[in-house]
Regions:
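C-terminal terminal-subdomain/extension
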Residues: 1-17, 92-141
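Short alpha-helix capping/helix-loop boundary micro-motifs
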Residues: 26-33, 49
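Non-catalytic surface loops within mature trypsin-like serine protease
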Residues: 49, 78, 107-109
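Compact nucleic-acid interaction/catalytic patches
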Residues: 51-58, 63-95
């Protein structure tokens, strides 16, 4: 994961936090390294900071489903978190330094294919299953 400092919101390529998608989105695991982002893949996009949405940074996001023509994704962090809102994913190919990652379960981001900076990796099916279990416990279908 990149630890580069904050940067201003880009004219194109920023993700948007969405609410209430839990009942609309169907969780899906369908990675396909075809150059397009699919559920089960870790991608990178510009994510705004919570305290100042005009500033943010490129972050890894796990694509968990689709809502129409938009992807739905959850943010990863390399900083340890103990809260029930975070799921320990361990390390993966999305982090070149091999650091463990935590997935934020309480914030869903919507992004268009064109908003992606790059694709990172495919999450193993059993790890995606853990994500699905955690999200279904929160009302996802």
């Amino acid at each position: 994961m990149s630890d580069h400092g904050p940067v201003a919101r880009p004219a194109h390529g920023a993700v948007t936090q969405v609410h209430g998608v839990e009942r609309l989105a169907r969780l899906d695991y369908s990675p396909d390294l075809d150059g397009l982002a699919d559920p089960g893949e870790v991608v990178w996009a510009w994510v705004p900071f919570e305290d100042d949405p005009a500033v943010g940074k490129d972050r890894p996001l796990l694509v968990v489903g689709r809502a129409g023509r938009f992807l739905l994704a959850l943010m990863l962090s390399s900083k340890p978190h103990d809260s029930a809102d975070w799921l320990d994913l361990g390390s993966g190919a999305w982090d070149h330094d091999g650091r463990p990652s935590w997935l934020r379960l309480d914030r869903v981001y919507e992004l268009h294919e064109n908003d992606l900076r790059r694709e990172g990796a495919v999450l193993a099916p059993e790890r995606f299953g853990r994500v699905v279990d955690a999200l279904r416990a929160r009302g996802w279908r």
